Structure formats: structure tokens, C-alpha cells
């Protein structure tokens, strides 16, 4: 259904596949790639980045969850900045930073988006900030101007 809807990428939570899912992560990655889609792996706030290292050569982006998945409007978890920096530095040191983007999802606000970008965030998911603002277009333009 995602492909039919026009998706150009699919991401999934590594935690959902590492222990109890029927398909191991590598099989899902291959399924996504065979359909000519970009593949991303998502990390919950408490999951260490190290769990993804063995998959880096196969993916296009990492989704760093900056809130616990489940519902919108949660507050940004400040320790996410350190995790983004850790991932960014690792990718730079491995000389693969130009191949893997860092997406940050959850609690992105006008007060913290610059810190997220400075730490290495490439794609910011700012749902509540945008859709609950008086002027969503102005909010997006302000964030994009940075």
C-alpha cells in the first residue's frame, strides 16, 4: 500500500524486529530496497545507537525518536541532542555521513529545532508545532530559513 500511495522510503523501528518480529531487520531492508525505496531504521529514545551499526551499509537514513512513540504533542527528550551528535560523529568518522541522513521525530519546536540541526539533524518532523500553530506556513518557513 505504501508503494501504491507514492512513498519513496519506508522506515521501521529496529526494536520491533530485533526480538519478536517474524522477519529479521535484514530481510525487511532487502524487501524495501527491492522496491527501489529508501530504507530507514528508527530508534526509540532509550535504545542505543550501537544496535544499528551492523545495518548502516544497507540503509539511507536513521530516524532518531525524540519522544516515546505512540502519540503526538509530547515534550522533546533533551538527551536526544547527545544521541544525534553521537550518530553524526560516528557517521563522519566512518566516512559515510554523505550516504546516511539523520531524521529526528518528536517534540520538535521553535525553541529546539536549531539545536537539533546543530547536532546533525537533517530532516525534522515537527508535527504538533506546525499543525497547532496559528500560521503553519509561516512556522515551516521559519524553520526552513535556518
Q: What label would you give each PLM region?
A:
Residues 3, 26-36, 83-95, 141-144:
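Surface-exposed amphipathic alpha-helices with a cationic face
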Residues 1-41:
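Glycine/small-residue-rich loop that forms an oxyanion/phosphate-binding "nest" at active or ligand-binding sites
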Residues 45, 53-85, 89-102, 139:
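Glycine/Thr-rich beta-alpha phosphate-binding loop at enzyme active sites
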Residues 89-90, 97-104, 109-146:
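Alpha/beta catalytic cores of nucleotide-metabolism and tRNA/nucleoside-modifying enzymes
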Residues 10-12, 39-43, 62-64, 100-106, ...:
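Hydrophobic faces of well-ordered beta-strands that scaffold small-molecule active sites
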Residues 15-17, 42-46, 67-68, 105-111, ...:
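Active-site beta-loop-alpha junctions enriched in small/polar residues
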Residues 10-19, 63-75, 119-139:
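Glycine-rich phosphate-binding active-site loops on the catalytic face of alpha/beta enzymes
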Residues 1-4, 47-59, 106-124:
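Catalytic cores of alpha/beta
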